A protein has these predicted regions:
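Sequence/structural segment immediately N-terminal to covalent heme-attachment motifs in c-type
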Residues: 38-61, 66
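Solvent-exposed, acidic/flexible segments
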Residues: 40, 44, 59, 91, ...
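Short Fe-S-cluster ligation motifs
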Residues: 79-99
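Cleavable N-terminal signal peptides
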Residues: 23-24, 34-35
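Bacterial N-terminal signal peptides that target proteins for export
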Residues: 3-20
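Short glycine/threonine-rich turn/loop motifs
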Residues: 40, 64-84
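C-terminal capping alpha-helices of c-type cytochrome domains
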Residues: 94-137
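N-terminal signal peptide c-region/cleavage motif recognized by signal peptidases
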Residues: 29-32
Length: 137
């Protein structure tokens, strides 16, 4: 039976390994903030379980359609009633902007309407890979 001490020790070991990897990446000049490559198939599954209540790839719903979102200026898809903040934004959807948006939409475009976030970096990377695949990228 696993004890609390064993679990805590395992967690410390994982954290230590993560710090070692991050330190090595910095020493080699690799930015730690670089997004990991996502899994588009897992992203599709996540999209269908988390995003589909408000979004669709092909049609506007509560939120805008996502077909072609990657590489597009925020607030520019036809037929959707974006908030004034999103319409006025200069944001173009790419890896970094989508990652920040999914983590905390309000921090990217204050005054936007989306009230949902994706806290896990791996989930965001997978969703971005899926959205990218649906944009011909």
């Amino acid at each position: 039976m696993t004890t609390i001490r064993q679990l805590a020790s395992a967690q410390r070991t994982r954290r230590a390994r993560a710090l070692i990897v991050a330190g090595a990446a910095l020493a080699l000049g690799h930015p730690c903030g670089t997004l990991a490559a996502g899994d588009a198939m897992r992203g599709k599954s996540l999209y269908e379980s988390r995003c589909i209540a408000c979004h669709s790839i092909d049609a506007n719903r509560i939120g805008p359609a996502h077909k072609g979102v990657y590489g597009r200026k925020a607030g520019s898809a036809a037929g959707y009633d974006y908030s004034p903040a999103v319409k006025a934004s200069a944001v173009v959807w790419g890896d970094a902007t989508l990652d920040r948006w999914l983590a905390n939409p309000e921090s990217v475009i204050p005054g936007q309407k989306m009230g949902y976030s994706v806290p896990e970096a791996a989930d965001r990377a997978d969703l971005i890979a899926y959205l990218k695949s649906q944009s011909g990228k």
